[in-house]
Amino acid sequence: MTLTSPFDLTHKTIWVVGGAGYLGQATVKQLYQLGATVHCIDLENRTADFISTLSPSSRLIAHSLDATDMTATEEFVKYQISTSSVPDGLVNMTASTTALKMEALSADDFDRVNHGGITATFMLARWVGEQMAARGSGNVVLFSSMYGTVSPYPEVYEAPMNKNPIEYGVGKAGIIQMTKYLAVHWGAQNVRFNCISPGPFPNPTVQQLHPDFVGRLSQKSPMKRIGRGEEIASSVAFLLSDAASYINGHNLVVDGGWTVW
């Protein structure tokens, strides 16, 4: 008798949107290592640069796409499904922000960020989700943030760092509710929706240039450290796997305990 690990993703096709970012790269690598065929989807230069660092493989496919462009995204979904298949999993890790203080934020700024953070996320989830529902199976992981649940500590964001802006947190709070709604809407069709709320995961550039900021983040965590990229990647892999087959509508908080203070 051959035992198969519930975490094995062999024969699964997974789209990772935002796959060339800091957390996206770790996620693409993890899913690939677990046997999945991974479509890494991101802006043109980011995708090409990242994929060029990896060993060539038929299970690792790069795509260039601005996921905030609704026309391009809908065409991408239709083309990929018509020429290949409906993916088994969709991971949307995209995010944007103005990095502006609240007093300087215009209505257009707010709307632009949340078009990408909420509207574009919803439309992609709907376009792919309805195809998964028609097939009778699927798995979607969206990305929120600890700042979709709590407000930033002002003292952490001393100059030159800008406090995490309001439009980002508002959008990430919306992702949590979107996840719950879609989980109910398509649950009977065996399509699961979950989201992940990362805690402090500053990218390598921030870690290198702003060690004092990283230190303040670490002190606010009960574990007294920032997160590592692979800790998000393994959380994504878990939610996509059969080990999580009865988890639906859940917001998995991966923050080292930040939000339990």
Regions found by a protein language model. Give the residues of each.
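Substrate-binding pocket helix/loop in short-chain dehydrogenase/reductase
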Residues: 101-102, 106-114, 154, 164, ...
